[in-house]
Amino acid sequence: MAGLHGPELLERYNRSLMGVFGTPQRVLVRGSGCTVWDADGKEYLDLLAGIAVNALGHAHPFVTSVVSSQLATLGHVSNFFTSPTQIALAERLLALSGAPAGSRVFFANSGAEANEAAFKLARRNSAPGAGGKPRTRIVALENAFHGRTMGALALTWKAAYREPFEPLPGGVEWVAAGDADALRAAVDETVAAVFIEPVQGEAGVRGHPEGYLRAAREITRDAGALLVFDEVQTGVGRTGSWFASEGVLPDAMTLAKGLGGGFPIGALIAFGEDVSTLLAAGQHGTTFGGNPVATAAALATLHTIESQGLLEHARRAGAAVAAALGALDFVTGVRAHGLLIGFDLAAEIAPAVVRHALDAGFIVNATGPGTVRLAPPLIVTEGQLLGFVDALPAIYAAATSEETP
């Protein structure tokens, strides 16, 4: 592959890969820490971390060594067998989440797969309530994003994502995000589960009012519905805590993205014996989920986050960049949850800002016409973040000029 450049590789990409992502912005060939390089030798500061995946940056030496060692020892065993790393990771996640006795973990390969498992878990909560009516409804939130596989897509709010693939699994309805009264009005004994992202990343990094998650816990408990937190984007330290659930224990929680430090893995944690036994033997499964290499990578990632104090660092660095962004006159709003940050622009030119940021050597993304998201590796320095803020006025000016007729 030596000597090949971006345009040639992108031409080959367009001839050989499905166009579901459009044409990639660059061909990346190498990464180290928070920096990546493209096929033409240009260097970029990665402030997106593969969409909140590379929690420890690129080619982290400890994760790399653990994965290499595990792959050289035992790579895959199927679901007929288990491995020490799979068991150890399940135990670690149960401990970190404060899981009560009887809680259990199911491993998958992605966030969408974890949410598919949670959807099936919810369907199993079908026993009629006191009034004798079957539990056929599932409630999700407006602006929610839970994935693009069929069950996860059925939970996702945006009609443009869903409509080309209808009919989807039925019985899903949406209520206004952050509105406890709307949730209370919607949830009764016919509801099997309520799905909530503690912070809606794809909606522009939007959290909920204080007390909302606790109210959701009370509402679902009273109705006999499961409360499922989708922490695919927010979990594993992204927001400066292991989880973004504000101390509220749901009935189930999904994880992925940063869990493997760049290696594909997802997880569903079911809390308590009653919930963890809803899915019986043979009712769900996966070939690759929880394989020795992925679980070893996740254990190494969790160890590094804890041993290097990255939860506190995420809180501190996130607050610093949020304050700096808020001081810019063209930034009209900032929402920072640790190192998951969304900021709004005075003009709806976020896609152009993203393009010019890339030209300037920064990887960020737009979650809407006027909102830019940052989700850098948890090892990013305040200096690197503030360097982006320093460059942002020129980037914004270039984007404004592009959008001006």
Model regions: which residues?
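Conserved N-terminal phosphate-binding loop of PLP-dependent enzymes in the Aspartate aminotransferase
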Residues: 1-405
